[in-house]
């Protein structure tokens, strides 16, 4: 299965498909909401 390259927007349903990590700007508390609205992007593995 191909992984999503860095910079690809990642959502709750596919955040595990990032080649690295799904990175959200505002920390863990906002994470579910941010994933919902598309604020998170794949980035280097944390």
UniProtKB/Swiss-Prot annotation:
Transmembrane domains' residue ranges: none
Key words of the record: Disulfide bond, Knottin, Secreted, Toxin
One Pfam family recorded for the sequence: Toxin_28
Locations listed in the record: Secreted
UniProt keyword Zinc present: no
InterPro entries: Insecticidal_knottin-like_sf, Toxin_28
A single GO molecular function term of this UniProt record: toxin activity
Signal peptide: none
Cysteine pairings via disulfide bonds: 3-19, 10-22, 18-42, 24-40
Gene Ontology CC: extracellular region
Keyword Oxidoreductase: no
Reported tissue expression: Expressed by the venom gland.
Coarse class of the protein's main subcellular location: secreted
Stretches the record annotates as Keys region for toxin activity: 31-33
Record note on domains: The presence of a 'disulfide through disulfide knot' structurally defines this protein as a knottin.
Function per UniProt: Insecticidal toxin. It inhibits insect voltage-gated sodium channels (Nav) by partially blocking the channel pore in DUM neurons from the American cockroach, not by acting as a gating modifier. The inhibition is only partially reversible after prolonged washout. In vivo, the toxin causes flaccid paralysis followed by death when injected into Heliothis virescens larvae. It also causes uncoordinated movements followed by full paralysis to sheep blowflies (Lucilia cuprina).
Family: Belongs to the neurotoxin 16 (SFI) family.
Protein name (record): Mu-segestritoxin-Sf1e
Organism: Segestria florentina (Tube-web spider)
Lineage: Eukaryota, Metazoa, Ecdysozoa, Arthropoda, Chelicerata
